[in-house]
Swiss-Prot record:
Mammalian complex I is composed of 45 different subunits. This is a component of the iron-sulfur (IP) fragment of the enzyme. Interacts with BCAP31 and TOMM40; the interaction mediates its translocation to the mitochondria; the interaction with BCAP31 is direct. It is a peripheral membrane protein. Its main location: mitochondrion. This is NADH dehydrogenase [ubiquinone] iron-sulfur protein 4, mitochondrial.
Amino acid sequence: MAAVSMSVVLRQTLWRRRAVAVAALSVSRVPTRSLRTSTWRLAQDQTQDTQLITVDEKLDITTLTGVPEEHIKTRKVRIFVPARNNMQSGVNNTKKWKMEFDTRERWENPLMGWASTADPLSNMVLTXSTKEDAVSFAEKNGWSYDIEERKVPKPKSKSYGANFSWNKRTRVSTK
């Protein structure tokens, strides 16, 4: 009986030590501040009185962008929906409207043979979720624009048997 009670007492003491160690470990893992930094800053900002500034007239932001004026006033933007990729059957690439700038003068680099340009906007393609968003962005930046409307493909109705028609050139002879 003494051996049984000894093992029970030993188990209880070991269990208590383990519980104390786990409690100390879990206390050390508790962060000192439960809010993340950005959440804490938002909470601090909300305590102060905030007022929104509304402007009734449309502001011209072209002077604030830092782009030279010859690249702003004479730019033409093409707004379009890109064509579907032929390598896949999905329409993933055709949901967004793209804005592409016109190409300006390019020349060949005499050292490397690369195509060079002095136009900072020529290789930039902007994306917008709707046509109206793209148009408003172009107007806000002072760019003239052309819109290519979305081309909706007409489904061609044909039967499966048309693939095996005897008078159509669907099967090519190997001879």
